[in-house]
Amino acid sequence: MTARRFVVGTAVVLGALAAPAIAHHSSAPFYDPTKTVEIQGVVTKLHIKNPHSFLYVNVDEKGQQVEWQVEMGTGAQLSRNNLTVETLKPGTAIKVSGQPSRAEGSRGMCCIKTLMKADGSAILRGTVPREPGQ
């Protein structure tokens, strides 16, 4: 009976310790998967790093320049999709859509659905890169 209690107790403790790690890898607590927001603006910077990269975009909201933060994947994921600091240089006009932040008053998004240049050419749709001309 003592060994059984030990095994059950150990399983409970390990399960409790794993929960935060599992929760971290879900964007749902921070971004609303039931909604999509689309912004159009100019890239100010792209930070490619692990575990998450960030794209910053200046957007005109009622005559005011407001910076949006777009959470992206790892550096390796971006590289596989041909997204580099050269692809999204500061000053590049883009349109991007994704899941909006749940934080009140926040200007952020993640889980990109589309990322396009101002001329409408696709840079990225979801996680599938598009060839030029598509």
Which residues does each predicted region cover?
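Short aromatic-glycine-enriched beta-strand elements
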Residues: K49-V59
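OB-fold/S1-family single-stranded nucleic acid-binding modules
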Residues: S101-T127
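Short, structured beta-strand/loop micro-motifs enriched in basic residues and often containing a Trp
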Residues: M72-R80
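Conserved hydrophobic positions within beta-strands
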Residues: G41-V43
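Bacterial N-terminal signal peptides
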Residues: G9-P20
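Bacterial N-terminal signal peptides that target proteins for export
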Residues: M1-A11
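Short boundary/loop segments of OB/S1/cold-shock single-stranded nucleic-acid-binding domains
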Residues: I22-V37
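Short nucleic-acid-contacting surface segments enriched for D/E, G, S/T with interspersed K/R
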Residues: R80-V96
